[in-house]
Amino acid sequence: MCGIVGYIGTRPAAPMLIKGLHQLEYRGYDSAGIALNHENNQPFIIYKEKGKVSNLETAVINDQPAATVGIGHTRWATHGEPSTTNAHPHLSMSGEIVIVHNGIIENYKELKEQLERKGYIFKSQTDTEVLCNLIDYVYQRNGRQLMAAVSRALYHAIGAYAIVVMECKDSSHVVCARKASPLVIGVSEDNTEYFIGSDATPMVEYTKRVVYLDDGQIADVRRGEDINLINLSDHSAADVNVKEINLDIAALSKGGYPHYMIKEIFDQPRCMRDCMRGRIVRVRDYSGNGEHYEVHLSALKNFKAKLIRARHVIIVACGTSWHAGLIGKHLIEQMCRIRVEVEYASEFRYSNPVVEKDDVVIAISQSGETADTLAAIQLAKEKGALVFGIVNGVGSSIARETDTGIYIHVGPEIGVASTKAFTGQVTVLAMLALALGNALGTITEEEYQQTCHELTVIPDKINQILEQNDRIKELSAMFADRHNALYLGRGFNYPVALEGALKLKEISYIHAEGYPAAEMKHGPLALVDEHMPIVFVATHQGQYQKIISNMQEVQSRKGRILAIVSEGDSVAGRICEHVIEIPHTLNALVPLLSVIPMQMLAYHVAVAKGLNVDMPRNLAKSVTVE
């Protein structure tokens, strides 16, 4: 998502900050800015630009500002559109406090209303400006002590944050804090320089000594002094643990992983939380005695009535996004009782499709630039349909061309083979189905609450699967010298079988086919022999007994079976050569778990074959030609 940099030292801060922002560009962003504190009790020098860091750099170089303390930020919009006004850093109304922030303040609307009643005026649409003025409000009423003001303000803020704050009266320090969003402080040998970042990438050139802030910690970082580190929960002093790192910049951008793909696979729990943050919220009951879940999707604000009236939804997408669309079909049909078709965008645009003015077309794309999907959107608009976009690329062509939509907010996906974008797309489709089903009354309140809760714990269950990485690496050996493979599933897991097969063929160059398990006997069974690896998705949810029968058919023909099964399964293990267990969840959400071993398996097969995992031959990340 966004990126934070900070510098406290003896060198000119502006070029240090710009260089740091360049090194965080891989995280993705739509605008950038820096704030400089050049002299006590003097106004901050602030530069903000929409678009690339290079735009910001031009403005800064032309001015050559003098300051040795500053903070910087690359923003990826979550509250408020991409614009210079909404870009960070944000200045308080008094002009005395400036802040950069990663994360989402979930109760920012309530805080904003409270501050407006106290006379505060806001310039942007962001939750960050609200937090900045909340700190300012406390600061002005508590002796203008920055550390105390930040601590007290954060007590009232609900959500996730990594923040760095400066005060204009003291140009020798910054205050930073974190909760559920990373923040790192680099330390020079003599404490004359400190470097701050969302990760260690911006500082590794200057120091190998870093302090990783833990959740719920706040730090006062002052030039020439030791870091003052406090636990927010009880205001007790915390130990400052300086660690030595020994990584180059390229390795750090991959988080220490050997490839972007495996990093992105392991990023998925965090990415899912980012995707749901501020969208699935726990709200106190009117009685005040309990809490319940609500799905808040700003994309529905002006279009809910038309979405509810729709009796026909068409999902258009390509590749992995098409597989997510197939899962979306199941979700929307089951929760909303609306008829859904899923079309390849490349076929839809040339088929003279039947689209009525009350229909809804959902366009799904990771990049937001897929040429065939853009053409399908144009056709749908010409026919009068409401077009709803689900994309990762903020400010992308699809985001601009659709009537409304939802960003998946999983951060930039570098590996060509999509992983975290897929789970982000399915998560958004689940939230959309929940919101519409609740509005339509086609799911019960119990189902709504149960599904919301289960979505929020899926990231923890993905972590359990990721712990099996070493074992899945061992299992990949059964594929490394094969030329063909079958992937089979039923119901919600049929699209997962398609996705698993696509992942294997994309990066390992092994021909693989995904099929509905019941259709195996209508052709693919002829391919089964003692050399053919077959992957079954055989979880307890759905048509379990049926797929066990399908597995027995393969076993009787000496096929080599690897099955993805529910935790504690005692039946499949007697039929299969190998099993991978995944935690239990609701049938509708199983794909978010069952796809994870598929991704890991494909990765390890490709690595074992010595292939370029992140850049497979003949493929591009964003398909911008038809």
Predicted regions and their residues:
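Active-site phosphate/pyrophosphate-binding segments
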Residues: 155, 268-272, 276-314, 404-533, ...
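Generic C-terminus detector
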Residues: 261, 560, 573-575, 585-626
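Conserved short alpha-helical segments that host acidic/polar catalytic motifs at enzyme active sites
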Residues: 1-258, 263, 267-312, 350, ...
